[in-house]
Structure formats: structure tokens, C-alpha cells
């Protein structure tokens, strides 16, 4: 993860961001709210260049290497930037995290993907894959979230 120190010791976190197809079509507002929230909470989402659909479903066949390549491209770009990869779409998170695990642990898949992509430096699962909510929980923290709330819902009945 790429951390830079801001004024008064506050950390500025920068993540590679994989929005996914759904956040570009049906969930544009969710994407906009996540980006705005990230700014308020002191971290930046730097969108992966030329990302492609992850496929939405993890391919179980080990011979289906082509279906994993878009995820490997995104993971490799994050690695080259020295950043963790964040996504907000749960399907993308699942697919990319599983492909990353394959690249880390399954030699045949790793070799075939790297041979196909002809990367300068082979990718071997070095990137940390996070869901946006994991960043909020584990990196930003609940105390910071509470501090940044503008309109608290105290006294409101929610889902009752």
C-alpha cells in the first residue's frame, strides 16, 4: 500500500480502484458516493486504466485461462503502482480475489497466465485485494467514520 504522510501526521491512503461494470451502469450513484466518501475519509481511489469486465463469475475450469486475464491485468497494474486493489462490487471482489489466490498458489495457472500476457515481470499474486467496506473497517476505522458523520441518525427508527 502506498502511504504518504499529510500535515499533522494524518495518513493519505491511495488505492488502485476497480469499479466493475455494474458501477458503470446500474450503480453509478454507488460509485459516486464511494468516491466522495473516500475523499472525506482521507483516501484516494485511483481507477485502473483500461480495466475490463472481470466476468462476474469465477471460472472453475483451470483450462479457462482467458477468463482470468482481465483480473490479472488489473492486479498487475496495482502491483506496479505499489498499491492495494479496491473494488466496491461484491462479484468483482470475489472473482479478483480468487484469481489472485490462483496466481499465488496454482503454478499451472500462474505460468499460463504470465506466458499469455508476456508481462515484463511475472505476476505471482502479490497484490492485496480489498472490498471498499474492508478499507472502511480495517484501514479507516469506526472511530474516524463516527467523527466524519454529518447527519447522525440518533433517535431514528431504522427497519423497525
Task: Please identify what each model-predicted range represents.
Residues 2-160:
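Iron-sulfur cluster-binding electron-transfer modules in prokaryotic oxidoreductases
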Amino acid at each position: 500500500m502506498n502511504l504518504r504522510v499529510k500535515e499533522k501526521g494524518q495518513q493519505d491512503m491511495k488505492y488502485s480502484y476497480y469499479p466493475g461494470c455494474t458501477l458503470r451502469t446500474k450503480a453509478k450513484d454507488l460509485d459516486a458516493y464511494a468516491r466522495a466518501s473516500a475523499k472525506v475519509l482521507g483516501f484516494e481511489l485511483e481507477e485502473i486504466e483500461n480495466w475490463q469486465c472481470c466476468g462476474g463469475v469465477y471460472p472453475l475450469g483451470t483450462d479457462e485461462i482467458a477468463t482470468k486475464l482481465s483480473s490479472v491485468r488489473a492486479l498487475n497494474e496495482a502491483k506496479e503502482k505499489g498499491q492495494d486493489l479496491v473494488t466496491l462490487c461484491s462479484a468483482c471482489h470475489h472473482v479478483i480475489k480468487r484469481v489472485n489466490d490462483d496466481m499465488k498458489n496454482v503454478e499451472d495457472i500462474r505460468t499460463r497466465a504470465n506466458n499469455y500476457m508476456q508481462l515484463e515481470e511475472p505476476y505471482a499474486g502479490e497484490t492485496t485485494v480489498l472490498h471498499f467496506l474492508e478499507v472502511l473497517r480495517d484501514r479507516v476505522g469506526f472511530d474516524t467514520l463516527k467523527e466524519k458523520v454529518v447527519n447522525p441518525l440518533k433517535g431514528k427508527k431504522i427497519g423497525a
